[in-house]
Curated annotation (Swiss-Prot):
Cytoplasmic side, ranges: 1-45, 169-656
Family statement: In the central section; belongs to the AAA ATPase family.
UniProt-listed InterPro entries: AAA+_ATPase, AAA_lid_3, ATPase_AAA_core, ATPase_AAA_CS, FtsH, P-loop_NTPase, Peptidase_M41, Peptidase_M41-like
Cofactor binding note from Swiss-Prot or TrEMBL: Binds 1 zinc ion per subunit.
Organism: Nostoc sp. (strain PCC 7120 / SAG 25.82 / UTEX 2576)
A GO BP entry: protein catabolic process
Name of this protein: ATP-dependent zinc metalloprotease FtsH
Membrane topology label: Multi-pass membrane protein
Lumenal side: 67-147
Name of the coding gene: ftsH
Cellular component GO terms held in the UniProt record: plasma membrane-derived thylakoid membrane
Listed cofactors: Zn(2+)
Matching PROSITE patterns: AAA
Length: 656
């Protein structure tokens, strides 16, 4: 599998507001606010009333508590005397009530016992009872039994009260949530403390300068109003994922020192009709109350897509939300003092009314960083990491074209994890190399065992690297490896020496030729019947490149023509499928030109490999033994094997 460069694709909180209803009454010419009684207070009042109603029933139904007969009593000292005089027949001790029931000798059988109030310590009484052989024992009082009965009754009542409170609370929460659906879920910070400053943002200097000016607008508006300048109402950050759009918004919030609202585009629309528009109104109402302020809407394409028919009829609620957003941003009333910052990676799907000046006055492109930007980003993210002095950040920046800021941060983090796993004290170039491979191609797999399959893969990968090295218009080879990563059994890496914004026809043909060289090497060594499915991904890539050369870039015998329209988004009311603005005859010619380009490049790769069969075998033996050949060593071996005949052939191929 040949890897040329990173491909970058464009992909595409919440606090409930609370409302307290009030009743306004006129009192001596002044307005007095009377809070409506809360449902929770009503619930507790009802529970208390129910308990008070039940208590008389519980206590009234207990005859022991309702009736208390007056009984004869003795003092504690008198009881001791009667025990000494052997006048006591039996004593019942009630430790709970701290009383003793005394039965005297000669007392009538139906006479009630005499009650005596006990002390906390009754050891003397018990010793005297034992000495005089008086019968005594412990009993439980009627009051203790009544307490047990009360607890049993409460065991039935408390669950009922708790259940009633639960139902009341749920009904209260349901009504409260229903009233709060229309409230904005934007997170509000009076002075946002994000921990991010403009010094923490690197690699996107142009975008940073634009947004620093917005902060200056907020802090020193007189500098601009003095010359008649108007504060921009909106700034749209556009760029692929991972380039730092949200990081820039955090930096603005940390630098501006003004109230800051942040919300995601998906937090506007809910399941209920009208909620989205209501939340937009509530958001801008709060913003006007705190002006001057900033509003950050992340992923605005979730609510700002183009209005149109699309497929189905379920997009009307989103359109209402967008219409309300357009009105609030630049409608009849205006929103002086509010600056809106939005971020998206799908600017092509946004409604044109949203993008016009007066709503989003500026569109700031936040693209993947160049070499200088990548170096600055690596310097920022390496501040808190232990990096070996031998590691060159500039070399890392050169070998990572197409990497975004998020990719570079992840790269250094993976290198730090590998360093800790290997129990090293600092990150070395070995961990950096492994981290790059892991980020681009995936996890490292189990090494291949020595077999025919391993040697076949070695021929395939050496074919890519050898042809790419022989063609002068091709990017230099960086590494050829047999270590499996992700879905690939082997990998060949090519890294450009410089940033390439434009690609020539000869460069495209060189890439097609080297990509086909893997299949060509298999056919030369093992024969056409033994070619494998390993070149399937390579064939898809070269077919796509060749077709684009013919239909999009005008690099074929058909002339400088663009023959295919871009596919539209069906859910935006655009084309259902690609439109072909040419006849069947032209379509046949397109197919013929695509086949001609691919076949020509395939024959070129076969000729180069056959001419350099000796060096190919040498490289395959070395790769099978070491499993990885670095780019410098690979190019050195190829240059040592060059001869005048090969050089003459290469000059002819490169001139085609």
């Amino acid at each position: 599998m040949a890897i040329f460069a990173r491909r970058i694709g464009l992909n595409q909180h919440s606090a409930y507001g609370s409302r307290q209803r009030v009743i306004v009454m006129k009192n001596f010419g002044k307005k007095a606010l009377i809070k409506q009684q809360s449902p929770k207070r009503v619930a507790w009042t009802g529970a208390l009333a129910a308990s008070l109603i039940m208590l008389p029933t519980m206590f009234g139904g207990n005859p022991v508590l309702a009736q208390k007969a007056e009984r004869e009593s003795l003092s504690y000292g008198e009881l001791i005397q009667k025990v000494n005089q052997e006048q006591v027949k039996r004593v019942e001790l009630d430790e709970t009530e701290q009383i003793a029931k005394v039965y005297l000798k000669g007392q009538k059988p139906d006479a009630p016992p005499i009650q005596v109030r006990l002390l906390e310590q009754n050891n003397e009484l018990i010793n005297r009872l034992k000495e005089k052989n008086v019968d005594f024992g412990e009993i439980s009082s009627a009051n203790s039994r009544a307490a047990v009965g009360l607890l049993i009754n409460l065991m039935w009542i408390l669950p009922l009260v708790a259940l009633m409170l639960l139902f009341l609370r749920r009904s209260t929460n349901a009504s409260s949530q229903a009233m709060n659906f229309g409230k904005s879920r934007a997170r509000f910070q009076m002075e946002a403390k994000t921990g991010v400053k403009f010094d923490d943002v690197a690699g996107i200097e142009e975008a940073k300068e634009e947004l620093q000016e917005v902060v200056t607008f907020l802090k020193q508006p007189e500098r601009f109003t003095a010359v008649g300048a108007r504060i921009p109402k909106g700034v749209l950050l556009v760029g692929p994922p991972g380039t730092g759009k949200t990081l820039l918004a955090k930096a603005i919030a940390g630098e501006a020192a003004v109230p800051f609202f942040s919300i995601s585009g998906s937090e506007f629309v809910e399941m209920f009709v009208g909620v989205g528009a209501s939340r937009v109104r509530d958001l801008f109402k709060k913003a006007k109350d705190n002006a001057p302020c900033l509003i950050f809407i992340d992923e605005i394409d979730a609510v700002g897509r183009q209005r149109g028919t699309g497929i189905g009829g379920g997009n009307d609620e989103r359109e209402q939300t967008l219409n309300q957003l357009l009105t609030e941003m630049d409608g009849f009333e205006g929103n002086t003092g509010i600056i809106i910052i939005a971020a998206t990676n799908r600017p092509d799907v946004l409604d044109s009314a949203l993008l016009r000046p007066g709503r989003f006055d500026r569109q700031v492109i936040v693209d993947a960083p160049d070499l200088k930007g990548r170096l600055e980003i690596l310097q920022v993210h390496s501040r808190n990491k232990k990096v070996d002095p031998s590691v060159s950040l500039e070399a890392i920046a050169r070998r990572t074209p197409g990497f975004t800021g998020a990719d570079l941060a992840n790269l250094l983090n993976e290198a730090a994890i590998l360093t800790a796993r290997r129990r090293k004290e600092a990150i070395t170039i070995l961990e950096i190399d492994d981290a790059v491979d892991r980020v681009v191609a995936g996890m490292e797999g189990t090494p291949l065992v020595d077999s025919k399959s391993k040697r076949l893969i070695a021929y395939h990968e050496v074919g890519h690297g050898l042809v790419g090295t022989l063609l002068k218009d091709h990017d230099p080879v960086q590494k050829v490896t047999l270590i499996p990563r992700g879905q690939a059994q082997g990998l060949t890496w090519f890294t450009p020496n410089e940033e390439q914004g434009l690609i020539s026809r000869s460069q495209l043909k060189a890439r097609i030729t080297s990509t086909l060289a893997g299949r060509a090497a298999e056919e030369i060594v093992f024969g056409k019947p033994e070619v494998t499915t390993g070149a399937g991904d390579d064939l898809q890539k070269v077919t796509s490149m060749a077709r684009q050369m013919v239909t999009k870039f005008g690099m074929s015998e058909l002339g400088p023509l663009s023959l295919e329209n871009q596919s539209g988004e069906v859910f935006l009311g655009r084309d259902w499928m690609n439109k072909s603005d040419y006849s069947e005859e032209i379509a046949a010619k397109i197919d013929s030109q695509v086949r001609e380009i691919i076949n020509t490049c395939y024959q070129t790769s076969k000729e180069l490999l056959q001419t350099n069969r000796v060096v190919m075998e040498r490289l395959v033996d070395l790769l099978t033994e070491q499993e990885t050949i670095e780019g410098d060593l690979f190019r050195k071996i190829v240059s040592e094997s060059q001869n005048p005949v090969v050089d003459e052939q290469l000059s002819m191929v490169n001139s085609q």
